[in-house]
């Protein structure tokens, strides 16, 4: 029987052909005709590469350059060693805090002629965590004073006690609220809690004063470093990342921790000088002021 003209029919089976011409009706699991070609799968976002840290060869070279530079500006192997050791302990304080707060594994980088840098694998989860990380360096860094104070007292050596004083001053200067020092990262979120513009105005003003202080006291490398940092902050449009602002209780705790850390660092610096002044506080305080070039009698 022939198919009725004008109506479609199933294709006839040809036993001599290897091709199946039978028309198959779409099943319930087939794509609709307009979606017969599946859309390409979205590209996977590549996971951020893990920071492997400073290359060992460059780390050794940077440390040697830093040690030579410190010896050149201090004229003392002991004081240069104290400053270098203090830098490592300071940065290790940041590393411990980063690892504890889920930002690790953090790495330490030595930057010749400037200092060190602790770098985590990810950003802090909140501004409060950022404050804790920034204050961990100066607070933990004071531990580096212990061996130099002990040897200085045992040998009655002014050189070793001066090394301990330098370690305390490294941590105290880092608490200046000038970008990119630790003080700006600890105090900046507190100022932002009051008003977003207050952080920018206050930190840039303090940064400018710090540059002027460096130039006026002959600390030209520090002044250049701070000047570049302040300029880069001026070019940046957004200061605070999307971590969420501090709550008022967190802002209060941040300010209290900042002031307490600064007070402990200042007391440690004066304490390291007390054996050199026979235990007299006022002469030790004057020695500290003369060191930072802001006065002293």
Regions inferred by a protein language model and the residue ranges of each:
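Hydrophobic transmembrane alpha-helices and their immediate loop junctions
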Residues: 2-297
């Amino acid at each position: 029987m022939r198919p009725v003209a004008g109506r479609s029919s199933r294709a006839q089976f040809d036993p001599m052909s290897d091709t199946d011409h039978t028309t198959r009706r779409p099943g319930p699991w087939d794509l609709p005709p307009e979606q017969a070609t599946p859309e390409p799968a979205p590209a996977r976002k590549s996971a951020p590469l893990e920071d492997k840290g400073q290359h060992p060869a460059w780390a050794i070279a940077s440390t040697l350059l830093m040690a030579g530079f410190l010896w050149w500006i201090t004229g003392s192997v002991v004081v240069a060693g104290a400053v270098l050791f203090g830098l490592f302990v300071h940065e290790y304080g940041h590393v411990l805090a980063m690892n504890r707060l889920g930002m690790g594994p953090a790495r330490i980088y030595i930057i010749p002629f400037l200092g060190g840098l602790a770098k985590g694998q990810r950003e802090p989860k909140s501004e409060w965590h950022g404050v804790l990380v920034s204050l961990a360096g100066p607070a933990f860094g004071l531990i580096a004073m212990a061996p130099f104070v002990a040897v200085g007292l045992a040998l009655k050596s002014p050189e070793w006690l001066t090394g301990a004083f330098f370690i305390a001053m490294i941590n105290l200067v880092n608490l200046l609220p000038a970008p990119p020092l630790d003080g700006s990262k600890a105090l900046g979120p507190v100022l932002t809690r009051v008003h977003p513009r207050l952080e920018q105005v206050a930190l840039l003003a303090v940064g400018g004063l710090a540059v002027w202080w460096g130039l006026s006291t002959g600390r030209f490398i520090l002044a250049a470093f701070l000047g570049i940092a302040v300029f880069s902050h001026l070019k940046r449009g957004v200061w605070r990342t999307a971590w969420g602002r501090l709550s008022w209780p967190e802002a209060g705790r941040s300010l209290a921790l900042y002031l307490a850390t600064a007070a402990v660092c200042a007391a440690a610096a004066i304490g390291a000088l007390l054996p050199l002044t026979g235990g007299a506080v006022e002469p030790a305080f004057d020695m500290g002021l003369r060191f930072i070039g802001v006065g002293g009698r």
